[in-house]
Regions:
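Short acidic loop-to-beta-strand element that houses the catalytic metal-binding Asp/Glu
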Residues: 1, 113-126
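Catalytic cores of nucleic-acid endonucleases
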Residues: 2-23, 85, 104, 129-161
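Intrinsically disordered, low-complexity terminal regions enriched in charged/polar residues
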Residues: 24, 32-77
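Acidic-basic catalytic patches of nuclease active cores, encompassing PD-(D/E)XK
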Residues: 26-28, 63-114, 150-152
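A short secondary-structure junction signal
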Residues: 30-34, 138-139
């Protein structure tokens, strides 16, 4: 699957209304809310052979993109050290920080697949939370959802006939 197709399917299937993106720049932690994750923020990578070696979309920001997001309104919410103070990997720590900032209790890890909803609901808006370096989606997951939806549509169509 090409990057463009993977992005198109991800956007089509996503249960999120918007995204909270986080990144570390010069040891400071920033976050910004966006409607879509821009293609230039994503790279196609392969997971390790230990994890199956599957292709995936990965959220990656270089310093120029981080500087651009800061100019566009990313706000400093802490430091890189703050991420390390919270148990779990940096991505989980970032999610927990976002939950706490919004007065909510964190959900269990990976409790909802990305096409079913966001990571957090704030004022009725479902947000996916991603820290720089996070996996966005594996291509095989996109293929699985595509098959599920195709089968559901065929079942619904047969019921109409």
């Amino acid at each position: 699957m090409k990057k463009e197709n993977a992005i198109r399917y991800y956007r089509k299937f996503s249960g999120a209304d918007a995204y909270i993106l986080g990144f570390v720049y010069k040891h400071d932690l920033y976050c910004i809310t966006v409607d879509e994750i821009m293609p230039r923020f994503m790279r196609v990578e392969k997971s390790s052979s230990k994890k199956g070696g599957h292709e995936k979309l990965q959220f990656r920001l270089n310093n120029a993109l981080k500087e651009q997001l800061i100019r566009k309104g990313a706000e400093k919410i802490g430091t890189e050290t703050n991420l390390l103070e919270i148990p779990g990997n940096k991505g989980v720590s970032f999610e927990r920080m976002i939950y706490r900032m919004n007065g909510q209790e964190p959900r269990p890890k990976d409790s909802i697949r990305f096409d079913k909803g966001g990571d957090i609901n704030i004022n009725g808006i479902e947000y996916q939370i991603k820290l720089d370096g996070a996996q966005i989606v594996e291509f095989r997951t996109l293929n699985k959802i595509q098959k599920e939806r195709k089968n559901a549509w065929q079942t619904d169509y047969r019921m109409v006939l």
